[in-house]
Swiss-Prot record:
The keyword NAD does not apply. (2R,3E)-phycocyanobilin 1 binds at residue 82. Light-harvesting photosynthetic bile pigment-protein from the phycobiliprotein complex (phycobilisome, PBS). Phycocyanin is the major phycobiliprotein in the PBS rod. (2R,3E)-phycocyanobilin 2 binds at residue 153. Contains two covalently linked bilin chromophores. The alpha and beta subunits exhibit high affinity for one another and form heterodimers. These heterodimers form heterohexamers of 3 alpha and 3 beta subunits which, in turn, aggregate into a heterododecamer consisting of 2 heterohexamers. Belongs to the phycobiliprotein family. The modification N4-methylasparagine is found at residue 72. The gene is cpcB. Gene3D superfamilies: Phycocyanins. This is C-phycocyanin beta subunit. Signal peptide: none annotated. The lineage of its organism: Bacteria, Bacillati, Cyanobacteriota, Cyanophyceae, Oscillatoriophycideae. It is found in: Cellular thylakoid membrane.
Length: 172
């Protein structure tokens, strides 16, 4: 797992180069925006159970076959596993937001997830829909100006969206 700073230094070191002005400027911008990043992580984390439960509720309303007898989320044990997986994905998205880098999400959560779902017979497309619903909720929270450090959050929102998009792509 790398944070944005470690990743930039590691890449420059591998090439045997000094940090470029563009790299330093990008990291400086990240530092300047750090309070927004912390606010976003805090708000998503504080609302995690609501984000997950509302996303699951919406998913099951759209795809009732998942909770019907024989469905992948039928029985309380399978439903709990589904909610747990959604919560884990959301948790690793917040880690990536905090670090400013997707490697923790990729390495510790998404790597091999599609294969696991295929082996279990879990429809990856349904998981992707659920992740998309969590993305919508998380972005609504991040884009709500109340309680967020003042300023433009569009770049951070775009970054957060990209982490959810990676998760969707990894499972579908």
């Amino acid at each position: 797992m790398f944070d944005a700073f470690t990743k930039v230094v590691s890449q420059a070191d591998t090439r045997g180069e000094m940090l470029s002005t563009a790299q330093i400027d990008a990291l400086s911008q990240m530092v300047a925006e750090s309070n927004k990043r912390l606010d976003a992580v805090n708000r998503i984390t504080s609302n995690a159970s609501t984000i997950v439960s509302n996303a699951a509720r919406s998913l099951f309303a759209e795809q009732p076959q998942l909770i019907a007898p024989g469905g992948n989320a039928y029985t309380s044990r399978r439903m709990a596993a589904c909610l747990r997986d959604m919560e884990i994905i959301l948790r690793y998205v917040t880690y990536a937001v905090f670090a400013g880098d997707a490697s923790v999400l990729e390495d510790r959560c998404l790597n091999g997830l599609r294969e696991t779902y295929l082996a279990l017979g879990t429809p990856g497309s349904s998981v992707a829909v659920g992740v998309g619903k969590m993305k919508e909720a998380a972005l609504a929270i991040v884009n709500d100006p109340a309680g967020i450090t003042p300023g433009d959050c569009s770049a951070l929102a775009s970054e957060i969206a990209s982490y959810f998009d990676r998760a969707c792509a990894a499972v579908s």
